[in-house]
Amino acid sequence: MVAAAGLLGGCLVEIRHVDDPGAAFGQARAEASRLQGQPGPAHRVNVLVFDEGDHKLVRVSLPMWIAKKIQKDGEIDFGGDAGDLAEDVRPHLRLEDIEKAGLGILVEVEEDGGDQVLVWLS
């Protein structure tokens, strides 16, 4: 397992190799479901990606202020470790739309090949 936490701003990037991402996605869905419909602004953008081909599970969590800074300076880049599915979802994630969506699950995708993406606000 590789994990990195940015001290400045509280960013988290966690990369693990797993055979079954079910537990991680179940935990993430439960967290997002508890927040669904709650009042108040989002403070974090959370992304969980599983690449079936590489058996790679990537979790990214970043504060909204960093997401705003990233969008102002350019596009969101999940990095090469996030996989093709995350890069397919990325162009459809506009920060102004994300902020309007409210807390909880924003996007959930599961491809036939086993790749998965879950994006939620907390």
List the model feature ranges, each with a label.
Residues D19-V47:
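Post-signal peptide N-terminal segment of mature Sec-exported envelope proteins
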Residues A42-L48, D54, S122:
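A membrane-pore/channel beta-structure motif
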Residues S33, V45-V47, D77-E96, G102-I105:
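N-terminal post-signal-peptidase region of extra-cytosolic proteins
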Residues D51-H92:
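Mature extracytoplasmic domains of secretory-pathway proteins
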Residues V49-D51, M64, E111, L121:
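Flexible glycine-/small-residue-rich
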Residues C11-I15:
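Bacterial signal peptide processing site
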Residues I98-K100, G104-L121:
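Short, exposed beta-strand-loop hairpins at the edges of beta-sheets
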Residues M1-G9:
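Sec-dependent bacterial lipoprotein signal peptides
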